[in-house]
């Protein structure tokens, strides 16, 4: 995998996108390009610059949410939360945003997933577990199991399953094959079980 080339393509897409009007669609594309650049740099071992790009992605996901007025675009707070977690940053503001938007009570499983991530970021593990058990229908069971786990062994088993399912996939956001969910869950585990 040529991570340098993937980074350069993503950075070029981001720079090109900044020259356009920043409507909702363009803001999502900017966020996705920043996400790809950050993950590519992470794979190159450049954690500092990866963090810059991942924080940029989180900011653009929030801007696109604010521009959209769509109360069910849950991928945006999820993207922001995961980007900040992987960057090693405090994701508390993004977590409060997701919860204030109603993620934990959302009708869709993906919305409730955003809520569970947000609750875990804020250290509200018991509440997160209660919401996580509602994800069963229409949601990847390995991710739901990891989110609901209250001990490190069960969590580790579930995250290993997430990694395994990642290896079986053939499509990835921005064509960047990085196990972002597992990386974010690893960060949460380091906070929950140590």
Predicted feature residues:
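Long, ordered, amphipathic alpha-helical scaffolds
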Residues: 144-194
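Eukaryote-skewed repeat-based solenoidal scaffolds used as protein-protein interaction platforms
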Residues: 1-165
